[in-house]
Amino acid sequence: MNFYNIFVFVALILAITIGQSEAGWLKKIGKKIERVGQHTRDATIQGLGVAQQAPNVAATARG
């Protein structure tokens, strides 16, 4: 029973220590994912602008 308590305590300390040291690595991945999301958003906005202008171009071409 005493071994179990010591094991849980050591595991908890290890988890806290590793979690704090790995935050930089996780933050870098989060920033990359956020950047991809921003690029996707910007491309979608540009695509919608082109799609909204297409009917005007078609109407102008018909006369």
From Swiss-Prot:
Pfam families: Cecropin (PF00272)
The keyword ATP-binding appears for this protein: no
UniProt keyword annotation of DNA-binding present: no
One GO location term (cellular component): extracellular region
Keywords of the record: Amidation, Antibiotic, Antimicrobial, Immunity, Innate immunity, Secreted, Signal
One GO process term, biological-process aspect: innate immune response
Subcellular location: Secreted
Signal peptide limits: 1-19
InterPro entries from the UniProt entry: Cecropin (IPR000875), Cecropin_insect (IPR020400)
PROSITE patterns on file: CECROPIN
Residues found modified as Arginine amide: R62
Main location: secreted
Protein role: Cecropins have lytic and antibacterial activity against several Gram-positive and Gram-negative bacteria.
Family: Belongs to the cecropin family.
Name of this chain's protein: Cecropin-A1
Organism: Drosophila simulans
